[in-house]
Design a protein with these regions (language model features):
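Short, surface-exposed secondary-structure boundary micro-motifs
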Residues: 48, 102-103, 346
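Ferredoxin-reductase
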Residues: 2-96, 115-116, 155-157, 168-171, ...
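C-terminal accessory/binding modules appended to enzymatic or scaffolding proteins
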Residues: 257-291
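FNR/FR-type flavoprotein reductase catalytic core
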Residues: 86-254, 261-263
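Local cysteine-cluster metal-coordination motifs and their immediate loop/turn environment
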Residues: 288-310, 323-338
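Low-complexity, intrinsically disordered Gly/Pro/Thr-rich segments
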Residues: 8, 227, 318-331
Length: 349
């Protein structure tokens, strides 16, 4: 979608853990755009600056739909002076925020037909479970079946946990939802809803046998718990999201810079490649069109094929071992290392 939607901030409020919730109204958006706004999905904020004034594109989770054109996003202040921090500092009621498109990989429809669902989230990754839980609560209030949900959260300190009152109320007033917070950097006594440290294997056993597991957090968090869940619940349907992009390779300050090129199998043309950037970033730098969305190895939109060459990749969340064996890769997770790396942009599944 190329149309830019000018969304108006209707209101905002602060949550714990340096999070601010913004309610945005997609003024003038057509039905096609509005139908893509889904709780648990993402919306693309386009051409919004960071503190250096450089326009950026960022994705934020939709945590609630209030009206067909009014939705909420939750944004965490990071202290890195990026787009999120700039939103915190500059957006007020009436501010205009440009949106490009919205998309969803996990929605309430993905999980509502299971008997039991487990959710694990770290930090701002709580936004995905919150969106899904709110939708399930709405279904439950209307008399519809919802799965039994267990939510495990990881936060450094008790004071960092957002939406805590809402979660407690839901736990104490329904028979289908329960949650537990694991506090990793504060000395606390264990009780019903709070445990010190990270979730142990015994904690995962308390999830019983979920039909589906939702994981959302940093890339490290999502990768770790994806592996643990796959090992413990091999039959469960897994939905994993990460809110941090793949890390670029770290080079020694004394290392000689390496040169690389990307060769295009379809045309035989080539471009110089920066080995500190992903293939996706290199293509964008050279104005070569490629479909992309999440930039985190989740959606699979930037799939391509690696024909040959020296490259490395960060773990993704959507390719199978068979895909990788057939040379498929995600441009956002793959980094050229040296020499010529031949790629086919129009990969077939």
């Amino acid at each position: 979608m190329n149309q830019i939607i000018q969304a108006r901030c209707e209101y905002m409020h602060a949550e714990a853990g340096g999070i601010k919730v913004f309610a945005l109204r997609a003024n003038g958006a057509d039905t096609g755009f509005l139908n893509t706004l889904q709780p648990g999905g993402h919306v693309s904020i386009i051409r919004y600056p960071d503190f250096s004034g450089s326009p950026q594109q960022r994705f934020y989770s939709i945590t609630r739909m209030n009206e067909p054109d009014l939705f909420e996003i939750a944004v965490k202040r990071t202290g890195h002076r990026g787009v999120s921090d700039y939103l915190h500092s500059t957006v007020k009621e009436g501010s205009i925020i440009p949106l490009q498109y919205a998309a969803s990989t996990v929605t309430v429809a993905s999980i509502s037909n299971f008997q039991r669902v487990a959710m694990l989230a770290g930090g701002i990754g709580v936004t995905l479970p919150m969106a899904l839980i709110r939708e399930l609560a709405s279904l439950s209030r209307s008399g519809k079946h919802v799965p039994a949900v267990t939510l495990l959260l990881c936060f450094p300190r008790v004071a960092d946990v957002p939406f805590l009152h809402e979660l407690l109320e839901l736990d104490l007033t329904t028979d289908w939802f329960t949650f537990r917070v694991f506090v990793t950097r504060e000395d606390i006594q264990a009780c019903t809803h709070f445990q010190p440290g990270r979730p142990s294997d015994q904690s995962l056993e308390a999830l019983q046998q979920p039909g589906a597991v939702v994981i959302c957090g940093s890339r490290t968090f999502a990768h770790e718990f994806r592996q643990r869940v796959n090992h413990r619940f091999p039959g469960a349907r897994l939905f994993a999201e990460s809110f941090t992009p793949p890390s670029s390779p770290r080079e020694s300050p004394l290392a000689s810079p390496t040169s690389a090129r990307l060769l295009f199998a379809e045309t035989g043309c080539a471009i110089e490649a920066d080995t500190s950037k992903s293939i996706l970033e290199n293509l964008e730098t050279n104005n070569i069109p490629i479909r992309s969305q999440c930039r985190s190895g989740i959606c699979g939109a930037c799939r391509l094929r690696i024909i040959s060459g020296n490259y490395r990749f960060e773990p993704d969340f959507c390719l199978s071992e068979e895909d990788r064996a057939n040379g498929h890769a995600l441009a956002c997770c793959t980094f050229p290392m040296s020499g010529d790396v031949t790629i086919a942009l129009h990969a077939t599944r």
